[in-house]
Amino acid sequence: MSTPPPKLLRALAGETLERPPIWFMRQAGRSLPEYRELRSRAKDFIAFCLDPEMAAEATLQPMRRFPMDGAIVFADILLIPLALGQDVWFEAGEGPKLGELPPIEALRDQVEASTGRLSAVGETLARVRAELEPDRALIGFAGAPWTVATYMLERKGSEREAARAYAYAHPDELDALLDVLVDATARYLVMQAKAGAQALKLFESWAESLSEDVFERIVVRPHAAIVEKVRAAGVTVPIIGFPRGAGAQVETYAEGVPVEGIALDVQATAALGRRLQAQGRCIQGALDNLLLREGGPALDARVDQLLAQWGDGPWIFNLGHGVLPDTPIENIARVVSRVTGKPVR
C-alpha cells in the first residue's frame, strides 16, 4: 500500500481534512533553547544559514519537539542579495545591514551564478528530507522581490518609506531591479524543489501601505512572473504566496497570482478566508503571534474560533507572522496539541 501524501500537501491540493495541518513561521528560532545553543556555535548568522549541517539541525529541532506537519528550511530572505553581490551582514540587536547597492547591470550579470552560490541551501534541504518522516512535508522559501528590494534599497531592516518613495520617483529603475529579483528568485526556488522541497513559499513581508496600482505592479506582477518561470522549469510542487499586510488587496493578489495556497495575516476576516476556500484555494494562517506569546484562555478561544470558521475548507493552521523570540514553549505546545489532538511533552 502506498503512503498517502503529507497532510500539508493534501490541503494545498484543495482537500478538506479532518483537521488542518499545522506549522509555524519561525518555528525554528530563538524561542527554542536548543536553537540558541546551536546558534552560539556559528561565527555569524550568514555563516549559520550557509552551513548545511547547522541549518538542517535548526530546521529539524521544532519537528522533534512538536508534531508539526511541515518543516520549513532554515535560511534567510537576504541570501538572494548576498548571492547577487551585495554585502549582507547582521549586527547584534540591530538586525540586517547591507552594503551599497551594485548597479543593476552588475546584479543582472550575477543572476545565473547566484543559485550556485546558494547550493548550501539545497544541501540543507537534502539533509532534512533524508531525516524527516514521509508524512511530514518539507517547505522551501524565498523572499518576494519587493520585500527583498526594500532591504537592498534601504540597506537595513527597519523603515520602508524610502523604498516606497523610490517606487514613485524611480519606477523604471525599480522595475529593472524587480526583474532581476524575479529571475534570481525563480531559479532559487527551482533549485530548492529539485533538492527536496515539497512546497514553496514566497514571503512578501512588506505588502502593506501600497496603493492599488503600485500593489499590482510591484507585488502581483512579480509574483505571477515567478510562478510562471518556476512552472516553465518543470517544477510542479505547490506554491504558497504571503502578501502580508495587503488587507483587502489579498483578493486582487488571488486573482492575479496562480498559487495553490494563500497565507493570511491577522487582518484577514473569516469571510475573506471562506471566499478564497470557495474558489478552491487553500488558505494558511492566521493566529496572532502576540496572542501566541501571551497565552491564557484567550489563546484557546481564538484557536477554537479559527478551527470553527475555516475548518470546513482547505486550510493550514499557522500564524499571521513569525513566532516571537520570547514566546513560551508551553504556549506553542498548547496550540499544537489543541489543533492536532496529540499530546506534546
Swiss-Prot record:
It is found in: Cytoplasm. The keyword Cytoplasm applies. GO terms for biological process: protoporphyrinogen IX biosynthetic process from glutamate. Substrate binds at R26, Q27, A28, G29, R30, D76, Y151, S205, H321. Its main location: cytoplasm. The record marks D76 as: Transition state stabilizer. InterPro entries: UROD/MetE-like_sf, Uroporphyrinogen_deCO2ase_HemE, Uroporphyrinogen_deCOase. NCBIfam families: hemE. Homodimer. This is Uroporphyrinogen decarboxylase. It comes from Phenylobacterium zucineum (strain HLK1).
